[in-house]
Amino acid sequence: MKVSRIFLVIFLSGIFWLVIAQFFFCTRFQYKQEASAFQGNIIYNPYANINAANWEKCNFHAHGNAWNGLTNGSGSAADIHRVYDSLNYSVHCVSNYHQIDTVDAAQQNYVSAYEHGFNLMKTHQLVLGGRDVEWLEYLFPQTSNNKQDILNYLSLDTNSLVILNHPALRNGYSDKELSSLTNFNCMEVLSPYGISEKQWDIVLSAGKPVFVVGNDDMHDIYNKEQVGRMATILNLKNTNQASVLSALKKGEGYGIVLGKTQDPFQLPELMHLLVKENKLDLQLSEKARSIDFIGQNGKLLASFSDRKNVQYKLNTSDCYARAKITFENGTQIYLNPVFFTNTTNFAQVQNPINFTETIIFKVIGTLLYAAWLLWAWSFINGGRSSKSNRYEIPTFPDSTFPEFN
């Protein structure tokens, strides 16, 4: 009986510790009450220095068999690389959960990758270029402080790049959190688990230079429907890891969703996007059914039909403008934003630590867990029901009580 109580206490103590660690021991931060839009005297154009001959197709999010089949993924890393090579992808990663695959590490186009997160709400991040896996995680539905704490730890390696994965899935990031969280470089706007266009505009409207990524998020390499449907197109002179991460951080690329009849070997491309005297000049390799310019708070700024070349004048009130391009066969291109700024150093403003709240919550958490351990010790030892602690009611012979007439 006592052995079963011990095992029960150990199990419950572990669960209680996870709760205490997540909601009381996690660092707490101070967040801006209002987001700041893009503003400044400079217009940043991520396509200012591109060469239309240097577009390369990339996929950074794919899962194979890992952890002895415990996670969702079919096929080996070698299978994944072989299939993406056959579809003319210049860069393709295996991004298993909390595991950096090194099968192709000797290849010139190798980029280290892993997906971080095994929590209930699928609040996940993709880490590219990391040397080690970060194991800090919070299992239960996460608070803003939990998410910021994880992003801070993932960003400690300044050579790596952090991407918010499928933010629209299960509301992994709320609208308010997207406005306030920092320390991520890109967003997986294009995913088979949801197009996070609204979420991207929330981030951009908060004045954060976060650039688009499109990925297959493939879990079965043998399923043709999961492969080659979404991609990131980067402008690269070299396909090594340093060049790939640099292009992603500068926004020198775009996301693409392939229509069902789209030839994967003959994709429409951006020829140029020039900015002169606040006027944007966009040129495509083929005519598009529609070209929409979208700005602050997701507002439609302008729309054009049946064109391959368009111009739009960017106003300071627009703050930013990004183009969404749709072709007749359903293929869509999502360009990165052109925006007003005073600097091209895109280091995001950090959310400072709220030391007072952090200390108070840690003290409360410590007291709660200490109280739990005291109760657990009492429970294991039978509580107040043991003979040594039981109160015995004394008995008296009948003669000791007086008789009343």
Regions from the language model: what does each represent?
Residues L181-M187, G207-F211, M230-A231:
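Glycine-enriched alpha-helix->loop->beta-strand junction motifs that scaffold or abut catalytic
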Residues A105-N109, T158-N159, K208, K287-R289, ...:
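Short glycine/proline-enriched coil/turn segments at helix->beta-strand junctions
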